[in-house]
UniProtKB/Swiss-Prot annotation:
Top-level taxonomic group: Bacteria
Binding residues annotated for Zn(2+), in chain numbering: H116, H120, H126
Record's function text: Single strand-specific metallo-endoribonuclease involved in late-stage 70S ribosome quality control and in maturation of the 3' terminus of the 16S rRNA.
Principal EC category: hydrolase
Protein name: Endoribonuclease YbeY
Gene3D superfamilies to which the protein is assigned, alphabetical: Metalloproteases ('zincins'), catalytic domain
Key word Protein biosynthesis present: no
Cellular component GO terms, alphabetical: cytoplasm
Keywords tagged on the record: Cytoplasm, Endonuclease, Hydrolase, Metal-binding, Nuclease, Ribosome biogenesis, rRNA processing, Zinc
GO molecular function: metalloendopeptidase activity; RNA endonuclease activity; zinc ion binding
InterPro entries, per database record: MetalPrtase_cat_dom_sf_prd, YbeY, YbeY_CS
UniProt key word Hydrolase: yes
Length: 153
């Protein structure tokens, strides 16, 4: 029987002053549970919840895109044998806006984006159709096990 992956989690919430209701939805144990559900190997991750300015700056600096995005993943493992290491950056106002536009609970959207970002940290991508289909199927399966509906419906 295989053991569940171990997670070392650094949770940062500099946006808490502006988005206290988001921080209240995201206690450490909840965030860790969602990430562990998406980890296939031991991991060391930092999750940082930011405002629009920091999100835009990071997206512009590292992706060349001058706007805030919902989640950025910075993966640092150099080989498949290394533990999963990375930073997940979630932009609170973008996540809130998307959840409202999509008619889904904020907590469900955060769960989806944390699972999505964790998969990116493990090398999954969605730049081509086949990869996108595989990644979406994995996300949907993980979220169902966590009690959330299919985020793509």
């Amino acid at each position: 029987m295989s053991r569940a992956p171990k997670l070392t989690l650094n949770l940062q919430f500099p946006a808490a002053r502006s988005w206290p209701e988001h921080k209240a939805l995201l206690p450490r144990a909840t965030v860790a549970g969602w990430i562990k559900a998406a980890l296939f190997a031991d991991g060391e991750l930092t999750v940082r919840f930011v405002d629009a300015d920091e999100g835009r700056t990071l997206n512009r600096t590292y992706r060349g895109k001058d706007y805030s995005t919902n989640v950025l993943t910075f993966a640092y493992a150099e080989s498949e044998d290394d533990p999963v290491t990375g930073d997940l950056i979630l932009c609170c106002p973008v996540v809130e806006k998307e959840a409202a536009e999509q008619g889904k609970p904020l907590i469900a959207h955060y769960a989806h984006l944390l699972v999505h970002g964790t998969l990116h940290a493990q090398g999954y991508d969605h730049e081509v159709e086949e990869e996108a289909e595989e990644m979406e199927a994995i996300e949907t399966e993980i979220l169902a096990k966590l009690g959330f509906p299919d985020p793509y419906q």
